Amino acid sequence: MASEPLALDIEKEPSGPLFLAIADAITRDIMRGRLKPGARLPGTRALARALGVHRNTVDAAYQELMTQGWLHAEPARGTFVAEDLPESMAEPVSVSVPREPATVRPHLAFSDGAPDPRLVPDKALARAFRRALLSPAFRGGADYGDARGTPVLRHALSSYLASDRGVVADPARLLITRGSQMALFLAARAAVKPGQAIAVEEPGYPLAWEAFRAAGASVRGIPVDAGGLSVAALEAAIESDPRIAAVYVTPHHQYPTTVTMGAARRLKLLDTVERHGITLIEDDYDHEYRFEGRPVLPLAARAPAGLPLIYVGSLSKLLSPGIRLGYAMAPEPLLTRMAAARAAIDRQGDAPLEAALADLIRDGDLGRHARKARRIYRARRDVLASALSAHLGGRIFFDRPAGGLALWLHCENVSADAWAERAGVAGLALLPGTHFALDRAAPQALRLGYAALDEGQIARAVDILARSLPD
Amino acid sequence: MASEPLALDIEKEPSGPLFLAIADAITRDIMRGRLKPGARLPGTRALARALGVHRNTVDAAYQELMTQGWLHAEPARGTFVAEDLPESMAEPVSVSVPREPATVRPHLAFSDGAPDPRLVPDKALARAFRRALLSPAFRGGADYGDARGTPVLRHALSSYLASDRGVVADPARLLITRGSQMALFLAARAAVKPGQAIAVEEPGYPLAWEAFRAAGASVRGIPVDAGGLSVAALEAAIESDPRIAAVYVTPHHQYPTTVTMGAARRLKLLDTVERHGITLIEDDYDHEYRFEGRPVLPLAARAPAGLPLIYVGSLSKLLSPGIRLGYAMAPEPLLTRMAAARAAIDRQGDAPLEAALADLIRDGDLGRHARKARRIYRARRDVLASALSAHLGGRIFFDRPAGGLALWLHCENVSADAWAERAGVAGLALLPGTHFALDRAAPQALRLGYAALDEGQIARAVDILARSLPD
């Protein structure tokens, strides 16, 4: 049972905390295969002596790796490399040592448009969560049981939507969910009978299609052009296919192309939906991230009263993908059906998280965070756009997105798949158009979700992008 | 816009904090209708002056009531009684002022078996949550995306189940869910095709039936006797109804009757399930709460390898209904199907909560809490059993439950519904047998979930119970 000696290759002058450099060295050894799943690590005392560091430093490194799932401890037996390594093993972006040693290839990823969790107002959130847990309301179990979510958050969200987006949302018509994914699933359950279809944008958001299919609906792609969903094509589809009972749109920043649906087309869409009596599902997933021009209000802010419109939003894009909080606004009886289905699959909301986020909204922390994040992401967008023009101008084209956390890169004369493959080998993960295709041919394009990369990472990523452009 | 003067009837010598006494007085005025929804409250300064207390005290009372959803603040306008009063309005158990003024009737409730959220190790939980939010793993977004849940919690849970229950659960076969409700929904989605049926205990757990129906399955009741689910009746049902594809059981403490399934019947159940090739869904919802005799290991601890058994558990019963964390263990490919459905309806788990609970398990806080809670609940059970015998002996009978958070009270010669109605008028909420009935006649019985009531509250509740016994 004696463990192997562990000769770690730790950076001599790590740019971050020493414990992270140790954690990073161990992670590298696991990735290289020098430390196998199940292998036992030396005790913290022994390793500290071997490395000439304080035992607490080694302990912090082990704790960090346990939190990340690389190691696990067995009481009275020791610390072992996890048998079941985290999914992120292939993408160790989480090891936050900014300078990589020469032996390890830089590993970067353009996401599908995730925010930067490093910006999360974590101290304010931790404080708010603590307040929520220690509050008499939580200890008294007061919020047990409303499938629509904690009243206090529905009230706070109602004010937020009214002041920020012109959406008048009666708290009684709001449903808090676990991220917008659940809101989309519940919307489809409430709006569509099994066997019916939902018209969706193509290219579009595959996770929404999964939610709709899980709810028993089929999905039918409607083409997207430079103005967003083609309402003429939608109209034709509805007339030819009586199964279409709803349409799903991302008018603010179309996913994945980032285009904004213009005012005239918005009115035409509302009119089409109303005439055909179908449900409109509006996903306003990153409303806060508008950098240019006047804010575009959601369809929900100007839809005629009585239109069956389900408005879906998320706080995950605003904070971190790890904060699971979405919401939906819908008229009765759609909301009642959604709440009933939510109770059946999830009983009730998450009282402490909901109370904590209500606090952040009420105290203004969320608004402050949104302003700060908007400033940072806007700068990152500009860095990305400049670097792309400088390195790839002429070979590719793109519109600098007016908002959102991603840029849509057209590359008509290049295979986006081949490009993504070559970039992957060079250490940069990319999402080509095939990722967003339903039935039609995939666009030769890449979605570059840049927000989680800092400016140095963006520069390196564009460098790899340029070097791996297929001939 | 001037607000009405507010003449509050505050207890002169409140037994709790003064701010809670003020909050309580305001709540009473709302409930009495003296303060209407939408009414404006005086400013904190004015009210503090009127009451002769410090302004912070009034502020704390308002904050408390906003957290509970009774009031809401509008920036620059003032504080108002919520238009949309919390569901708990009819049951202000959350207002934790122990001594009620004579004008207000004591309001108590026997639950369906919820734990006491006042016992939650909230400080340890707040600390663990803070650590999780501030950890590099969370800020790095490392845990994004595994639909089975955070690896570190699956590892911690695996050790916990092995040491505590003899259940050998490979972390790769564990799925973390939002409470056991979602685990039950996903179990039915994975095990049963739409149109097929799940055999369930009757009387039984209506929320499980809702989850199964939401997954497209019908439910078929199998009678329960003093030894739990009748396996002979199950066998007959399977033979007569080929739609039955799964059976749902609560063998440890049958819900709602609290009886434990004996060893011989357990073996017979496993044998029946195996011979007919149906899936076994075992809900071990309150394993930790065994007061008497040797611990009874779950079916999952002794099921033959390869049996399609889905084992479902929850940390909500151990901590608080407000902490939404359940889990399921299942063999491949059931687990893969469950994880895929979970991704479609909820994308991913709750990284901070999962990391925080992994911490509580690893540090031993969860085990310490379980031991403490077990001691307290056992004492409460004894107080309840003694009070029932003293006040109602001869009219009713019950077995002192060996475990669990509820007691099943038989009252064959009394209408349980009439009893519940009379007790309700006197201020005690009760759950009669009708609440747990599917197709068969409801048992004349009451489920007394006592765990959330302290000993004084139990005494008062039994007093009301005795006084409202129908003739």
Regions found by a protein language model. Give the residues of each.
Chain A
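N-terminal basic, amphipathic alpha-helical segments
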Residues: 1-133, 137, 142, 146, ...
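A generic "structured core" feature
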Residues: 207-210, 276, 280, 290, ...
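Short glycine-rich anion-binding loops that position phosphate/pyrophosphate groups of nucleotides
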Residues: 115, 251-255, 317
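Active-site PLP attachment segment
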Residues: 76, 302-337
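Helix-loop "lid/cap" segments that line or gate small-molecule binding pockets
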Residues: 157, 327, 355-363
